[in-house]
């Protein structure tokens, strides 16, 4: 059995990196992996238990400061990994990768997944961005094996560091389409008559662009539903909440999971992701897995998914987005068209393929480590002189 420890996560369930790791960990168990996830105790209270779908939790404290949370938690997580000695320490994202040199110095085999250039996110200040750049450099240079979730990130790593990576994208499952509408009734929604976006409430998700475009567009009774957690209230979240409350038809649905989230996806008329920065957006893949028509900003991460040109609009162009909203609101997809979309995304981003490729990277990291150890033993052996 392969023992894997996962580092760099707040906990499950979640969005973004957490959603990626949540699916990955669950399926790793099916390939005979024993998975332990280092989580932040503030996000996973003890009353949730120590296991999640067969995945073990290791709760470790982290400070409340946004600037220090990841660094301190990752440092403590590496020390815990050094004590527990997993076969592979899998570090998720470039922030926690700041601790990769320490992990290697402590004799751990390390795989790093690069989910995107987080130093380009608008929410971070100068110091945090500097730490993220160092985390990227140290993580890529000192790990045993590196995974990137898109060709765009592979090219970034290749051009900046002269290093090759394993491209393993985010995956997506084909969900069963619920017919129930309890969540819609709770928010006063009509099936097929609302625009949906799902993301954390942070500046690079560009909620204000979407709200402005929705207010401009003539959508004849459609509503706009914003799903996503507010990690920490700040000036941006206050602006978005105030703007949403001042926009007739806008609905702040907060964090959703389980059946409620599935219902809100399944019955949406259109999904929109206007982000200025993404790695490979799971929320967009999930929208496609429900067969939804989608609109996305024309950033490289979205373009790489390979949708038809009509599904993209220029980043930050509110009027262009409003025009597309009106156009797509008039479209009606048949059930056959929705099923075609579902099959298309499932063929390209199948989760079991993602997990099998990840396990191969783990075993490659272990073989590399064993090979280096044999070389060192041969060099140090008196018989070799």
What kind of region is each of these model predictions?
Residues 255-256, 263-268:
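Short alpha-helical donor nucleotide-sugar binding micro-motif in glycosyltransferases
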Residues 293-296:
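Short hydrophobic beta-strand element within catalytic cores of glycosyltransferases
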Residues 311-319, 327-332:
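Conserved acidic donor-binding segment of nucleotide-sugar-dependent glycosyltransferases
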Residues 237-259:
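Nucleotide-activated donor-binding/catalytic signature segment of Leloir-type glycosyltransferases, i.e.
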